[in-house]
Amino acid sequence: MITRLVMIFSVLLLLSGCGQTPFKGKIEKVGMLFPDTINDLVWGTKGYKGLLNIQSKYNVDVYYKEGVKTEEDIINAIEDFHKRGVNLLYGHGSEYAEVFNLVGEDYPDMEFVISNAKAKADNVTSVHFSGEAMGFFGGMTAAHMSKTNQVGVIASFTWQPEVDGFIKGAKYENPDIEVNTKYTDHWDDDTTAVKLYQKMKNEGADVVYPAGDGYNVPVIQQIKKDGLYAIGYVTDQSDLGENTVLTSTVQNVDKAYEIIAEQFNKGTLEGGDHYYDLNTGVVEMGTFSPLVDQDFQQRIAKLIKTYNKTGELPKNE
C-alpha cells in the first residue's frame, strides 16, 4: 500500500514554502522506491532525507514505497506513481536499474533515477559514487590507528570500489599492514556481518570497515562494546561513538538526488551516468575521532586536496 508522507511533515514543509515564488519548473510530483526500510539510519534514511528536501524546496507532492524488490512490484509501483502524476521517479539502489532501463521508453513523460548502475534508456539517469578515493583515505586512517597491524573489511559485494581503495590506502600508510577482507553477498545480512567481525577480532584485527549500509550499525555497536575501532560507511557515524568511529566514508546520496532534481526542474538534466567524487561535496570524509592525531588529519586533508586537483591517489615510491 502506498505510503504518503506523514501529515505533520507535509504541513511543516508547506508552511516553510509560504511566500516563495510559485512552482513553475518541470517537476510535477516526485516518487521514490526503497528496496528495504527508510529507518535503517544509513542508506534508506539518506534517500528519504533527499525526498523530504525535494518536497520542501519545490513544494510538490512526493510519494514513497518501501520493500519494493521484485520485478512485478517495481512495475506495479511505476504504473501506480505514473497514474498519480509522478514525473520524477527515484529507485533507491542499483536493483532498480534493469526494470527502469527496460520500461523507461514506455513512460516518456517520466524521468527515472537509479544509483551505481548503468543508465541505458534515454530517460534514465544514474548517480554513481566514486568510492575508491573515500575508501583509500578510510584505509589510511585504519592502518594509521591499528596497534595490531591487522585491519578488516566486511563488504557486501566484490565489485565495491571502496574496498579496493581501502586496501590500497591501508598499504600506502603501512606497507606491512594485513587487510582481512570478507563478503556477506547481501547489503542487509547483519547476522553474517557480525559473525565475520567476531572472527576478524579473534584473528587480531583492531580496526574494521563494515562497508554495507544494512549491517554497519550493529557491527559498529559490537565494535564499541569490544573497545576496538571502526570506519563508518555511507553516513557520518561519529554519533555512534567518537572514540570508536575513527572517521567515515560518506556518500551524500540526498545531495546527489537534490542536484538531479534541480537539473530536471530547470530542463538541463542530461540522462546517462553522473559521477560524484570527493571534489563534489556529495562524497566526503566524515568527522575524525579526537583519538586521531591532528598531524595525520592535516596530512589527509592535503592529500585529498591534491587528489581533487589531479584525480590521482598517492602511491608508495
From Swiss-Prot:
Annotated Pfam families: Bmp
Localisation per UniProt entry: Cell membrane
One of the record's GO cellular component terms: plasma membrane
Positions of S-diacylglycerol cysteine lipidation: C18
Lipidation (N-palmitoyl cysteine): C18
InterPro entries: BMP_lipoprotein (IPR050957), Peripla_BP_I (IPR028082), PnrA-like (IPR003760)
SUPFAM superfamilies according to UniProt: Periplasmic binding protein-like I
Signal peptide: 1-17
Membrane topology: Lipid-anchor
Keyword set, alphabetical order: Activator, Cell membrane, Lipoprotein, Membrane, Palmitate, Signal, Transcription, Transcription regulation
Assigned protein family: Belongs to the BMP lipoprotein family.
Function: Positive activator of the comK gene.
Name of the protein in its database record: Transcriptional activator protein med
Phylogenetic placement of the source organism: Bacteria, Bacillati, Bacillota, Bacilli, Bacillales
